[in-house]
Regions:
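Flexible helix-coil transition and linker loops at the boundaries of alpha-helical arrays
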Residues: 8-20
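Start-of-helix register in tetratricopeptide repeats
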Residues: 18, 25, 59, 93-94, ...
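Residue at a conserved register position within TPR or TPR-like alpha-solenoid repeats
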Residues: 27, 34, 68, 102-103, ...
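Hydrophobic/aromatic packing residues within the alpha-helices of TPR/SEL1-like helical repeat arrays
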Residues: 4-7, 47, 81, 116, ...
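Short coil turns that delineate tetratricopeptide repeat
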Residues: 55, 89-90, 124, 158
């Protein structure tokens, strides 16, 4: 951490941004270490320092919100997590379960669905927001409405196993309605299921989960979600 600070101090403006981003990740790790010692105030200080270094330090927001929630600061926790949606909408799914759980604790049945709908309106290809809202509705006795969202989600990403799991939950609740099952079969006839793989842009290391540091090349924040495109499917079919 000290070495990285010295490098940041000596770097030009372009390199300083990169060094500060790495320092932010290191500050977040220090915060997590403080949490293992039950030093919440120290952890919060590290997470806040990370955000000051890099306003896009997603892990710092996630962990800061988690501490705020544990300390009973529910409104503050939600506000912190919502910053993730603002600064990195492609990572919004990381706060879905958190926000849904806290708003449920608060007795607010509208805030989370409204959030998902805003994200869907802002990005028509956001399959994760549709999945989150579909799962929310399915667990609250609205399987038909859930399936509409889940089928839309499948159109954008028919290969994600997480969608199919909730679809079957909703179909079971509808006693496997023939028309709905037929629609599901049409959408998934060519699908190959996988569990949300991620790949490091630096060294191509593959992971089934989002990692903040690559275990192979050790670079920070290099993982992106790998998607199977129609072109790739066509190439696979012809080979």
């Amino acid at each position: 951490h000290a070495i990285r600070q010295r490098l940041a101090a000596l770097a030009d403006d372009a390199q300083k941004v990169k060094h500060q981003a790495i320092l932010a990740f290191l500050q977040t790790q220090l915060g997590l270490q403080a949490l293992t010692r039950s030093e919440n105030k120290t952890a919060v200080s590290h997470f806040q320092s990370a955000i000051e270094l890099d306003a896009g330090a997603v892990p710092a927001y996630l962990n800061l919100g988690d501490v705020q929630r544990r300390e009973g600061q529910l409104d503050e926790a939600i506000a912190t997590w919502e910053q993730v949606i603002r600064i990195a909408p492609e990572r919004a799914y990381l706060v879905f379960d958190r926000i849904e759980a806290v708003t449920r604790e608060q007795g607010d049945a509208e805030r989370f669905p409204a959030l998902c709908r805003r994200l869907i309106e802002a990005n028509q290809q956001d399959w994760r927001a549709r999945l989150a809202l579909g799962r929310h509705l399915a667990t609250r006795g609205q399987p038909s409405e859930a399936l509409d969202l889940l089928f839309d989600s499948l159109v954008h990403n028919p290969h994600a196993l997480s969608i199919h799991q909730v679809v079957w939950q909703a179909l079971a609740a509808l006693r496997f309605n023939e028309a709905r099952v037929q629609r599901y079969m049409e959408l998934t006839r060519e699908a190959v299921f996988y569990l949300d793989p991620h790949v490091c842009m630096r060294c191509r290391y593959r992971s089934t989960e989002l990692l903040w540091q690559c275990p192979q090349c050790h670079e920070w924040n290099t993982f992106v979600e790998e998607r199977i495109t129609p072109a790739e499917e066509s190439e696979d079919d012809s080979s």
